[in-house]
Regions:
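Juxtamembrane regions of bacterial inner-membrane/periplasmic proteins
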Residues: 1-198
Length: 198
């Protein structure tokens, strides 16, 4: 390739990159993130020592107690990340290798064998309510990239810990820990309450 050809290819790739960024910014403006109200959640009446005395579901009848990663057992968080998304702190919201693996296994076995969703993609599905379809997965990918562009990894992990479904009307690790184990998530050990029940 000549110098003029290289120069032309660089110009085209730069233009394509600029158009891609402009399109992504336009999509971000047109389809804002459906972030939950930070004040939403169940009302919990606490004793002086922090023990819940009485809890009330939110307006939708969902039991959800707000929590932060540091309020959850580090063993639980470690087990969650190991089981659900061991590359959470290294990928931009989407793990193309996990998606390729899941697609390859589905083709070979003619059924869904493993998922390719990252923790961020799961948060996107929880917040956006995307359907289980090819279009839904594409939308999940776009929302995951959007989440990663707007929020820190800690904020994404917090959304997951607050919003992950644990059966029925129980959402979030803190509400599930109280409902199933009768103790706060900070005292929940990984072996007693595994991410697999998600």
């Amino acid at each position: 390739m000549t110098f003029a050809g290289v120069k032309k290819a660089l110009r085209w790739s730069g233009t394509l990159m600029l158009l891609t960024v402009a399109f992504a910014l336009l999509l971000d403006r047109l389809l804002p993130l459906p972030l939950p109200d930070p004040t939403g959640g169940s009302t919990v009446v606490l004793a002086r020592d922090g023990t819940p005395l009485r809890a009330f579901p939110d307006d939708d009848g969902v039991w959800r107690y707000p929590t932060k990663p540091e309020d959850v057992s580090p063993l639980y968080v470690e087990a969650l990340l190991t089981y659900e998304d061991r590359w959470f702190y290294k990928h931009p919201g989407v793990n193309p290798f996990a998606i390729a693996r899941a697609v390859g296994q589905a083709i070979v076995h003619r059924r869904l064998v493993s998922g390719g969703s990252t923790l961020t993609m799961q948060v996107a599905r929880i917040l956006d309510g995307t359907p289980h379809s090819a279009f839904g997965k594409l939308r999940q990918v776009l929302r995951a990239l959007q989440l990663e562009a707007h929020l820190s990894k800690r904020e994404i992990l917090t959304l997951y810990l607050d919003r992950a479904p644990f059966g029925g009307t129980i959402e979030g690790v803190e509400a599930a820990s109280w409902a199933y184990l009768g103790k706060p998530a900070a005292r929940t050990i990984a072996s007693g309450f595994t991410p697999g029940c998600l």
